[in-house]
Amino acid sequence: MHNSGGDGGGGRPVIEVTDLAKAYRVYDKPEGLLASVRGLFRRTSRRVEALRGVDLEVKRGEFLALLGPNGAGKTTFLKLLSGIITPSRGTARVLGHVPWERVDDFRRRFALVMGQRNQLWWDLPAAESFRLHREIYRLDPARFARVRDELVELLGVKQLVLQPVRELSLGERMKLELVAALLHEPEVLFLDEPTIGLDVVAQHTIHDFLREVQATRRVTVILTTHYMKDVAALCERVVVITHGDILYDGSLAEIVDRFTSHKVVTLEFDDPPSSERLAGLGFPCEVRGPQVILRIDRGRIAEVLPRMLQGDGVRDVSVEDVPLEEIVAELFRSTAPPSGREAVEVVT
């Protein structure tokens, strides 16, 4: 079990997941005309387990990052929690509801934003999509207008809402997608790769916006992303999922301490150091012009750093944790797929 407390007020968690699993049947398409004809009568299929029995609890107001390589089961998990698909086994409750029952009360209380799918009408201004959203959710006109104006102001997109969506940049569209998702004031927000393909400025704007929304409205957020800057900027809790299983569930700080035993030391010299000077450092290193990068055990930093600074030519020094991207990538590489995740059978 991977659990994290209950509701901040001592009640039940906002999201409760027990032994949640999802398997798909994928039919192989043979190559060649003859093989394709044979496949009409005798097909080979694979049963792929996207999720293998996940346990998770999320409390109100948490901002949780769900990390994993492509095919790990992240998007499948969000689709299950949103009620888009049904599980092969297991249970889930979001805001007290079983998601795939899709009752109206549940649908009014959550939102899903997928970075590669649009909810805004392509040929219409976003303002028209917002009005449609108001009708679908039967929102009070005055409250709708107030929330819309607050969100538009917060993201700085007032000048964009009357332009056809097809004329906007990717970053501008994503900002308006977030406005649309929050118009009905959901209590739970699922974000699937919301910053994919965005430039740095747009990413920072969305980070600031999500922090403000989460803090002021106490929205519970689950974010999937491949960008570790999203995680560092927004999330206190990290869940790493690989091959359909949860590998790690804990704080962002703990993942650094648990999975790395060293720090990155960067020495900057006035001039590129000689081979003799490098050999005198006593550790394998990477040289980038006047910069020398070393990886040193955490417990030895205080011992070896003064020795490295002896002699002339060292202009600057920095000691940092291993980048989060490297830690997570190593976690992905270190986990082999479990046996039996794919079962092949012949269907006649």
What spans do the regions from the language model cover?
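Conserved catalytic motifs of ABC-family nucleotide-binding domains
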Residues: 185
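ABC transporter nucleotide-binding domain
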Residues: 207-295
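Conserved ABC ATPase signature
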Residues: 123, 164-168
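Short, charged/small-residue-rich alpha-helical element at the C-terminal edge
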Residues: 263-334
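Catalytic Walker B motif of ABC-type/P-loop ATPase nucleotide-binding domains
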Residues: 189-193
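Conserved ABC ATPase "signature" region
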Residues: 34-39, 131, 135, 142-160
